[in-house]
């Protein structure tokens, strides 16, 4: 792919005249953010980021951690790994001990009425956005209860491609300006994969928690067929969350059918609605 021939996306980009004190890359270790990191490392995207930050939920597939170990060695800028806690352990402990349940978008069934629903998604904020935000403030030298100075700006690069425009969202902090370089280069996910192939780079897998309810059936089927240990873990987790916790009384399920995961007959991909593209903001799955 000749990057010089690609057109800019223009109107979708934030127009700002701020000079950032820090440029950080939000690294998920999936296809898009890894492409972004390696393009920056090779000088295709400038200026060079000051660092990348990977927010570890503690429940990523083993392949993601293996790939991240490789990727770190290819980059001329540091990669900081940050972590709030292990999302699996936190959720299971909340069920076992009646503690507050860390909310993820699990599918629900009311025990009395049988009505189906979905919990609010708070996991991305708690286990991705906030740990990255905390690290940014640390890099700026700003304490937890301190205000970032008025004229201090941070530019945050996020790996969203042209086929995921619905996931674009502004930063929640006024001093952080989100930017999407893959959109500026008019690059889609397939082109990211082509870029890896042409350069012979190690290919990343999709970065998302093993237990993520936004997995489509194709992902669950692939996990069941090719990564049976991960699938068995997901099935075990699905059973453990079934009866919720102190603040959740409905029955909970990982699969949108609200059936036990090991009993679901997965549908072909063409029949599935992609929850990642339309709901989850660009911190997971990239």
Task: Briefly describe each language-model feature range.
Residues 2-286:
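Nucleotide-activated chemistry modules centered on ATP-dependent adenylation/adenylyltransferase
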């Amino acid at each position: 792919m000749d990057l010089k021939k690609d057109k800019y996306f223009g109107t979708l980009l934030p127009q700002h005249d701020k000079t950032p004190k820090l440029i950080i890359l939000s690294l998920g270790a999936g296809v898009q953010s890894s492409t972004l990191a390696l393009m920056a490392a090779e000088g295709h995207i400038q200026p060079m980021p000051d660092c990348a930050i990977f927010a570890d939920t503690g429940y990523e597939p083993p392949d993601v951690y293996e790939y991240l170990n490789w990727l770190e060695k290819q980059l001329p800028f540091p990669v900081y790994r940050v972590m709030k806690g292990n999302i699996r352990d936190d959720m299971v402990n909340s069920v076992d001990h009646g503690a507050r349940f860390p909310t993820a978008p699990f599918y629900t069934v009311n025990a009395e009425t049988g009505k189906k629903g979905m919990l609010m998604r708070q996991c991305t904020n708690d286990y991705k956005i906030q740990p990255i935000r905390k690290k940014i403030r640390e890099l700026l030298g700003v304490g937890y209860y301190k205000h970032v100075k008025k004229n201090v700006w941070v530019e945050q690069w996020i790996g969203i491609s042209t086929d995921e425009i619905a996931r674009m969202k502004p930063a929640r902090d006024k001093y952080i300006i989100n930017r999407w370089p893959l959109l500026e280069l008019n690059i889609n996910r397939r082109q990211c994969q082509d870029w890896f192939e042409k350069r012979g780079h190690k290919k990343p897998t999709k970065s998302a928690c093993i237990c993520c309810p936004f997995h489509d059936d194709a992902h669950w089927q692939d996990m069941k067929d090719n990564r049976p240990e991960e699938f068995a873990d997901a099935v075990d987790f699905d059973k453990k969350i079934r009866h919720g916790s102190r603040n959740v009384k409905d029955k909970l399920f990982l699969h949108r059918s609200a059936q036990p995961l090991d009993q679901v007959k997965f549908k072909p991909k063409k029949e599935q609605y992609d929850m990642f593209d339309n709901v989850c903001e660009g911190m997971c799955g990239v």
